[in-house]
């Protein structure tokens, strides 16, 4: 009891001290947390250091903001450009890594001001053009601000014009870059290389293994497949409003607008003008211009002044001659005007020649043939000239009109080298949008790997055999690679079954009702076909297993320009009748696979519907026969290749079908098959079908191997 009283007496004296200590502790802890939050917020909103990789733009910087880097006189200098460099020897593709979007990542170094030991700047202030170039890259899908993810590195050192550089000190600045590593995976942009008196055709700054996107390369300095030849940008053609002029003959047949040309060229041009009179116009700089008129905007012939570059639109052909440098900005002006450039500059590597087909937009004439240039140009057909005029204008719009266009085209070329299976096609580089929108991609120019949109679309042509149709749908739906099933309902007198009656399958099923009962309806390029691969299958082909169909699709992926199918047939020459004969009996050879069950590229639907020679398509529809033979002729004629028969199965007769169910069971129908071959051979003017003696089977087919370990165990019987 006494102890209890004693405790109660002392208790009240201890409790306030404990509360005070705890209060001080929590206040201190709260203060620390609050200060931490304030500091974090200030860090987030306070201007970051210049080392922030994304903050390089000169528009965001003043001279005080840019860190100064002083280069000692004995700073290391990179080796001269290695002329032996190629992508497989000097480029580290492993830095690019796996990228599901097949896009390289480009890192731009933070902006810094480099000065020599005496404090003299290495180069002039960053130019507007180079700032636009870096901005274009940073705004593109290629850009990354994470240096560890970068595949390509671009310095913020302006190298566009060598005249504004101190060559040695610039090289020393490059060597100071944190990821330089002898220039590996570094991209340098230069449009005006060399300097007096030699004017070399490549940047004189030592750069070791760095890639060079240069204007004015010669074949002696250009590392094919490594460097990128780019245009010399013309601000004049980019800034002047020059409405497009339609193709066709113009006032002058040939025009020269360059100033400060070599005297020998001037003599040749004068001789051309004297020989051909007003058809040739030779311009030079103007000597007596009114005050305030920019000299760059005028050209003169004798005492007559012309607005430049507007005068270029008055000529059919415009000459582009070598000057002190091989690359000339006049090429951009000429393309903008829709004038066909006549390039007379031996060894000049044309801009983006790795991907652009300059034969479609220009005429290249050797310097020694300059006196014959007029007769050479006269030999070009008028229609070809008009096409070249359109192509010239398109090249300017797509690749020359801005620094951004030049930068992105350069990165796309490098991207295509690193991810060749996803490279842009020849047509995409060279065809104007109007041409591309009106055409279909040719399957003969497919990527090196199958498209990412895996799978195939099964097209079932049917009339009224609903029961067997449903069985076909059920069996085909078991194939793992099936993407969509399209039923072509060819019966105009009967409606398809109600939606609730159709088999429930895992992929979309679409029914298309046709306006007329035509066999060619199965080969129409329906919008619903979204995959590259198409499986044409009849509504009575109920015997094929899912393994057989999946294996057939895998074979097609290896040979996407072939007809890959199951029922094999042969054409033979009948010596007694002196004509072709259709053979359906089992033989050692095959020249056709019937499209009652066959894979092919969807492009051939387009060709069958719109490009089938002669009256074959109408003949097929009128006779209700031979659409499959017509497709075999078409594919063989386009590709020059044989069909591929897959799996050993030879019997494709529907066991439940009666004699009146199928067209192919009619004797007259079989006789017409031979007539079809002769008819089609006559229309094509040749026999395109190729005879082969092999078929494709799974690797372990008939091997004494556990079935469960085979990829395609259920290939079926004959």
Swiss-Prot record:
Subcellular location: Golgi apparatus membrane; Golgi apparatus, cis-Golgi network membrane; Endoplasmic reticulum membrane; Secreted
Membrane topology: Single-pass type II membrane protein
Cellular compartments per GO CC: catalytic complex; endoplasmic reticulum; endoplasmic reticulum membrane; extracellular space; Golgi apparatus; Golgi membrane; membrane
Primary location group: Golgi
Residues carrying covalently attached carbohydrate according to the record: 288, 637
UniProt: UDP binding residues: 461, 465, 490, 517, 538-539
Biological source species: Bos taurus
Pathways per UniProt: Protein modification; protein glycosylation
Positions of a protein binding: 582, 584, 651, 653
Transmembrane segments: 26-46
Co-factor(s): Mn(2+)
Protein name in the entry: Exostosin-2
